[in-house]
């Protein structure tokens, strides 16, 4: 049975439901993720686009030739990335409950961009 994950932005204007399984849970420290979020590392989880339902349409900014970063138009909360291929990557910090074993990162992208003083 597929699990449903719920979350949303800081102000509550945008809520989402994503039907699992959660795919490719990972962390990333690339410059784009750092600038998008203001954090040194982001935790991502991917879902097929047709398995993600939004209560309101997030704002997007075209960040590359294959993806757009999504955020709340009212409070600016980072929500994730909407790829041209049918994938939506959501940031785990926007989930209502992130304390699930299946959401633990399986790998880290761009580990070389992580500050040396940052705990592993």
Please identify what each model-predicted range represents.
Residues 1-8, 13-120:
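A short Gly-Trp-Pro
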């Amino acid at each position: 049975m597929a699990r449903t994950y719920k979350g949303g932005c800081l102000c509550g204007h945008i809520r989402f439901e994503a039907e699992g399984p959660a795919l490719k849970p990972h962390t990333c420290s690339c410059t784009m993720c750092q600038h998008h979020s203001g954090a040194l590392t982001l935790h991502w989880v991917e879902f097929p686009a047709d398995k993600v339902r939004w209560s309101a349409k997030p704002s997007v900014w075209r960040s590359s030739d294959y993806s757009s970063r999504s955020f709340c138009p009212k409070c600016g909360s980072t929500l994730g990335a909407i790829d041209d291929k049918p994938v939506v990557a959501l940031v785990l910090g926007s989930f209502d409950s992130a304390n699930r074993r299946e959401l633990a990162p399986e790998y880290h992208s761009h580990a070389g961009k992580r500050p040396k003083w940052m705990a592993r």
